[in-house]
Regions:
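Outer/extracellular conduits and scaffolds centered on Gram-negative outer-membrane beta-barrels
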Residues: 1-279
Length: 279
């Protein structure tokens, strides 16, 4: 058996595998084809064409994890804190994948209009269904026959697979995102390669500030120790490579499911008050 499939994400669009001769937990996804010159191959639809086999793009295992706990006190005031960290290890961000397909992420603003790099074009005869878009100057108010001019065009860098010529096919930004991101392995250009991210972080796990009452005061109450404190948990990240998502918002608790972001509840901060007494 050359490999074992540990996890299947998005109907086979991404997989976590244990491959003979490789560290366990490699991430495999569909990636675009290239020619011998390193240029992407573009279909007649204006979209990239994926290779037939999934390719390795990362590994879910971190290079290191750890934590730090420390406590300080001054007279009767004390402060405790704990910090957790993770170095390396990739995650597959399903939430990012599907949100980008729907135009809900900041990254999907690219090409949406002229301000964000979109090209201007029209469909001859306003034939949006089967017409080939024609690029025009952004200042043009309408096509030669009064056609609607759109400003959300994108031309993907590469060469047309069927001709070997430079790609000049304009496609709408929404079409590009929906056909490139999304769920599954179809259409042929869909890929999870943009949704694999480093998950390194340094996090303030817990912070406690409290006051310990003097022994001579509490001894009259029959106590040997009395303290009151306020605490907070999951307060913030000092550093987080995974932007806009909580680094611990995985779909499960197993070592493989922790490498998939999506479908979890919203991360929360917890605050509280603690009163501890010893008799």
């Amino acid at each position: 058996v050359p490999y074992l499939e540990i996890s299947n994400i998005g109907g086979g669009g991404a997989k976590i595998q244990a491959v003979e001769g490789r560290p366990m937990g490699d991430i495999y996804v569909q990636v675009p084809q290239m020619n011998e010159n390193g240029e992407y191959l573009v279909s007649d639809k204006g979209l990239y064409m994926n290779q037939t086999e999934l390719q390795r793009v990362g590994n879910i295992n971190p290079d290191g994890v750890g934590g730090l706990f420390s406590s300080f006190s001054y007279k009767n005031i004390f402060l405790d804190f704990s910090i957790d960290f993770r170095i390396g290890g990739d995650v597959i961000n399903e939430m990012y994948q599907y949100s980008t397909a729907s135009g809900l992420t900041p990254e999907s603003l690219q090409f949406r209009d002229t301000e964000h790099g979109g090209l201007s074009y029209y469909y001859p005869g306003n034939n949006n269904a089967s017409g080939v878009p024609v690029q025009v100057d952004p200042s043009l108010g309408a096509g030669p026959n009064g056609e609607t001019v759109y400003h959300d065009g994108v031309i993907l860098p590469g060469v047309v697979a069927s001709t070997g010529e430079k790609n000049t096919r304009i496609i709408p930004a929404g079409y590009y995102y929906n056909q490139t991101y999304n769920w599954g392995t179809q259409p042929e250009q869909l890929t999870y390669r943009h949704s694999v991210f480093d998950n390194s972080y340094v996090k303030l796990r817990e912070l406690t500030i409290g006051y310990q009452f003097p022994e001579k005061l509490i001894s009259k109450l029959g106590m040997t120790r009395l303290s009151v404190s306020v605490f907070g948990r999951n307060l913030f990240y000092f550093y987080k490579a995974l932007k806009n998502y909580d680094a611990e918002s995985s779909v499960g608790t197993s070592w493989a499911s922790q490498a998939v972001v999506g479908g979890s509840t919203t991360a929360t901060r917890n605050f509280g008050v603690s009163l501890r007494a010893s008799f």
